[in-house]
Amino acid sequence: MIRELIIFTCCLIGLMSCKQADSNIHVHYSQKVNGYDVSVKILPDSIQEGYFSDIATRKAELTFKRDGQQLIVENPCYADKSLTAESLTSGMTIDYIPFEMSESGTFRGNQSPFFFFDVDFDGEVELLICLWEGMGYRGYHAYQAYETNVGSGTHQLSPMQEAPFYELNDYTEFDPINKTISIPQGVGLKMNGEKVYGLVDGSFTLIERVQYDWEHTKGVKYEPCAPTIYHYKIVNGTEILDRIEKCPNDK
């Protein structure tokens, strides 16, 4: 009797697990991206519609398969403009939205949920995952970068954690000629400044800090007014004031 009860309990747990697994929503992209077949497993209880915009965001697990390699990435803020909360059904096949770099060298205006891009100027592309509206502002996204040269087999990827790659967003500016990455600080109605990282001896290091001073703009109502900009060079870990750009309205 006890043996039968144990078997029944195990079967019940198995059925419950299958039911829970079946509740996930599976989506597949019709095109290969950088040679990878891409599928997405969405957790249905995580869907948030219209928090910052009319695009639904949700927790998801993305899988990239190519030539015996399987890469798995988790995204807490996955979104695709092809998917809405109302139309979302398991087994859907959707078209991939290609990535386009802006003319300013930033990700601004990007609508792609993921793409491949050489973030560290080494000639090989990394996987970029879009955290939809992850900056906390309507229509502006954060990004996580992943290295993909991990060999064959199945790999649960972790994002690149070293600076500046852990704070990429729509305003991040890439300069492949000078091999610099500029990270904005205090993004909102008025930015506080930016940090500039340069490639030195094969690794990125902070080479400049830019500070925006908006104090003189408080009384200006009707004419355009820019901040006073302080440029600091970083030399052996020490900040040295390099130059000051003053707004014409700064008396």
Protein language model regions, located:
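Acidic/hydrophobic-patterned starts of short beta strands in beta-sheet-rich repeat architectures
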Residues: 40, 119-131, 176-182
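Short, surface-exposed coil-to-beta transition loops
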Residues: 111-112, 128, 139-143, 167-168, ...
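Acidic, small-residue rich beta-repeat scaffolds with periodic aromatic anchors
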Residues: 18-70, 175-251
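Beta-propeller blade repeat segments, especially FG-GAP/WD-type strand-to-loop junctions
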Residues: 65-67, 138-160, 196-201
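Bacterial Sec-dependent N-terminal signal peptides
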Residues: 1-27
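Repeat-based blade/solenoid architectures
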Residues: 83-112, 163-172
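Beta-propeller blade termini
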Residues: 28-30, 110-119, 166-182
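Beta-propeller fold detector
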Residues: 73-77, 156-163, 206-213
